[in-house]
Amino acid sequence: CSNSDSHLNLPIVYKKKSKLYKEDFSLFKNLSSNFMMTAHILYKNVDSKNLATFSNNIINQIIRKKLNFKGILISDDISMKALSKNLSVNADKALNAGCNLVLYCGGNIKESSKLLKNLRTIDEFTQKKTYQFYNFLR
């Protein structure tokens, strides 16, 4: 548990891994959702250097493997104050860690255009999953 709000600053959680799995992560085990969002939280005892959205270990080893999540992983808003002010760097870090999509809620058209020019094309897995979900909704 953290007393911080990632809209304002970076929350840091010091719980032991075993406690995190039992109390926090277990809720997501074998979740059948098509989408899941990462959190801008630093789990000190899991990855002491990277917040969850930027952590290859948390995304690939925990969310994808241990929790068996097979859907699209979306970053939380990359313009939140818990992160640096460089949106392109934030987007790259999230995608490189394993997020399929990045969320930008800042509403600045110039920043949105800049991000779109710099981001890579959505991968085949994400396209396929998004299309499947779209067909499900129809």
What are these regions (language model features)?
Residues 1-118, 122-126, 133-136:
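Second-shell residues forming the walls of enzyme active-site clefts
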